[in-house]
Swiss-Prot record:
Name of the protein: Holliday junction branch migration complex subunit RuvA
Region Domain I, annotated ranges: 1-69
Subunit structure, as described in the record: Homotetramer. Forms an RuvA(8)-RuvB(12)-Holliday junction (HJ) complex. HJ DNA is sandwiched between 2 RuvA tetramers; dsDNA enters through RuvA and exits via RuvB. An RuvB hexamer assembles on each DNA strand where it exits the tetramer. Each RuvB hexamer is contacted by two RuvA subunits (via domain III) on 2 adjacent RuvB subunits; this complex drives branch migration. In the full resolvosome a probable DNA-RuvA(4)-RuvB(12)-RuvC(2) complex forms which resolves the HJ.
The UniProt record lists the keyword Kinase: no
A UniProt-annotated Pfam family: HHH_5
Gene: ruvA
Organism: Nostoc sp. (strain PCC 7120 / SAG 25.82 / UTEX 2576)
GO BP, sorted A to Z: DNA recombination; DNA repair
Ranges where the record places region Domain III: 158-213
Primary location recorded for the protein, binned into one broad class: cytoplasm
Length: 213
């Protein structure tokens, strides 16, 4: 089994919706690896040396290589593939939607509303991911070195806050990060009013947008 490849970036191309292929030249041979869009944005320009952690899969007798930025990202991809009904496309979509620690926390907390923001991931699949992986990821994230995220809003409040922020056009990653900041840095109680969570989250998101500009 190929654990990782270290080589020169020969090219990156989008070959379809949410499908990115990295061509990596290793010792004179070119390897095509499907990678998350998030990784594609992080990679250096063509000609630079990189290390990519890999997952090898044979589908319909066709060998496929998937590439990831870290062993933890690859391991989480494998955990997702172990869930009934989850294929590589859905697993990569989930990895692209949230940062690794946020995705792990969303699964452990059974935060279906966040998970269904990933393209091609419906409510039933999201619920199955939470059901089948929660116990595994509670243990796995310790060995992976992920922080234990704060709870954020209480479950009854969380869904309403998320749906409001999604309706305003914010992404799952932006919403997850904003709620973490509001809970951790501002110290808003998890049972505070919905309006307070929304107000504080929008304030943080607006300030972040101003900084980026």
């Amino acid at each position: 089994m190929i654990s990782y490849l270290k080589g020169i970036v020969a090219g990156i191309q989008n070959v379809g919706s949410n499908r990115v292929i990295l061509t990596l030249e290793v010792n004179g041979m070119g390897y095509d690896l499907q990678i998350p869009q998030r990784l594609a944005k992080q990679l250096p320009t063509t000609g630079d040396l990189v290390q990519i952690f890999t997952h090898y899969q044979v589908r319909e007798e066709i060998p496929l290589l998937y590439g990831f930025s870290s062993p933890a990202e690859r391991d989480l991809f494998r955990h997702l593939l172990s869930v009934s009904g989850v294929g590589a496309a859905s697993a990569i979509a989930l990895l692209d939607t949230l940062e690794l620690p946020d995705l792990v926390q969303a699964i452990i907390a059974a935060n279906v509303q966040i998970l269904i923001q990933a393209p091609g991931v419906g409510k039933k699949i999201a619920e199955r991911v939470c059901l089948e992986l929660k116990a595994k990821l509670i243990e796995w994230r310790k060995s992976a070195g992920f922080f234990v995220a704060t709870e954020g809003p209480a479950p009854g409040i969380l869904e309403e806050v998320q749906m409001t922020l999604f309706a305003l056009g914010y992404t799952a990653h932006e919403v997850s990060h904003a709620l973490h900041v509001v809970s951790e840095d501002i110290g808003l109680p998890k049972d505070a009013y919905v309006e307070d969570w929304i107000k504080q989250a929008i304030a943080h998101l607006s300030s972040s947008e101003q900084v980026s500009h």
